[in-house]
Amino acid sequence: MGNVFTGMNISATGMTAQRTRLDIISQNIANVNSTRDADGNVYRRKSVIFEEKNYVSFSDSLVNATGNLGKGVKISQIFEDTEEPLKKVYDPSHPDADEDGYVYYPNVNTVTEMTDMIDASRSYEANVTAFNASKNMQLKALDIGK
C-alpha cells in the first residue's frame, strides 16, 4: 500500500520523463541542418526509451507476489538512431563535402519531430492533470477531516 503522495510521485516521474523527451526532440530539431557535431561526426536522431520504475517481470510476479502497484516511469536510455540512413546531398562547394562532393545531413525528419513534440506535450499535460487531481483529492480529504 502506498502513501498519500504516491499518485503525485507517479505523475511527477511522468512529467520528468516527458520533459526529457521534449529536450531530446528539441535537440533533434535544432540539429536538422547541422553537418557536423562537436566531435566532427554527423548528428544522428536521438529518441528516449522509457521503462517502468522498479520493473518486475511477469514471470517473477507469478512466482513472488510483490504487491507492486507501480512507481512511475523512468528513462531507460537515450537511443541514437544508427539504422536510418543519413541524408546525402550533392554540394561540392560546401566546406563539409566529401571527396565526391556530397554532404551528409542528420537523419532527422522535422514533421516526425513535430508530431513527437505534440505527443510529448500532451503526455506532459496529462501528467499535470493527474497530479492536480491527486492534489485536489488530498485537499478534499483534509477538509473532510476538519
Positions of PLM-derived features:
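Amphipathic alpha-helical polymerization modules
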Residues: M1-K146
